[in-house]
Amino acid sequence: MSATRLDVPVVRLPHGMDLPLPEYATAASAGMDLVAAVPAEVPLVIAPGAWALVPTGLALELPEGMEAQVRPRSGLALKFGVTVLNAPGTIDADYRGEVGVILINHGREPFTVSRGMRIAQMVIAGVQQITLVETGNLGETARGVGGFGSTGLDRTP
């Protein structure tokens, strides 16, 4: 199945001019890698348990009805314990500032973010706005009010 591609205007900010634009790694990739626009001579070090806002050097003009989700890269999480703190971070269609990534280091060692390092994924998705309608009751379901583990952990018979 071939999806229709949208053109999304992007601005490279002065501190990101030499960095590659995000792109899909494979034909079936859902996300595009975002890279760090930290100064080459001053890498960003995130101590264990600390977090930092990492610049990307990019600003987007998303179409109305779309959002960009900033998600972790699984390799950083598995190898270093580094992930996106507010995953998924949301970039609204009316935001025009720099895309930033809040990384947190859950690892045991300091983590160094260097210029051009792939730090997160950006997934573009549609948004459906709703209107909440206050009511006195909700329709019944098999699950009911069960939540937070109410369906169990073990799926073996």
Swiss-Prot record:
List, separated by semicolons, the cofactors it needs: Mg(2+)
Keywords annotated in UniProt: Hydrolase, Magnesium, Metal-binding, Nucleotide metabolism
**Binding positions for substrate per the UniProt entry:** R73, S74, G75, N86, T90, I91, D92
Q: Does the keyword DNA damage apply?
A: no
| Reaction(s) the record says it catalyses | dUTP + H2O = dUMP + diphosphate + H(+)
What's the Enzyme Commission number for this chain?
3.6.1.23
Please explain the role this protein plays, according to its UniProt record: This enzyme is involved in nucleotide metabolism: it produces dUMP, the immediate precursor of thymidine nucleotides and it decreases the intracellular concentration of dUTP so that uracil cannot be incorporated into DNA.
Organism of derivation: Azorhizobium caulinodans (strain ATCC 43989 / DSM 5975 / JCM 20966 / LMG 6465 / NBRC 14845 / NCIMB 13405 / ORS 571)
The source's superkingdom equals: Bacteria
Q: Does the keyword Magnesium apply?
A: yes
* Similarity field: Belongs to the dUTPase family.
Per the record, the gene is: dut
Q: Record's SUPFAM superfamilies?
A: dUTPase-like (SSF51283)
Q: What Pfam family is a match for this entry?
A: dUTPase
Q: Known PANTHER family for this protein?
A: DEOXYURIDINE 5'-TRIPHOSPHATE NUCLEOTIDOHYDROLASE
Q: What class of enzyme is it?
A: hydrolase
Protein name per Swiss-Prot or TrEMBL: Deoxyuridine 5'-triphosphate nucleotidohydrolase
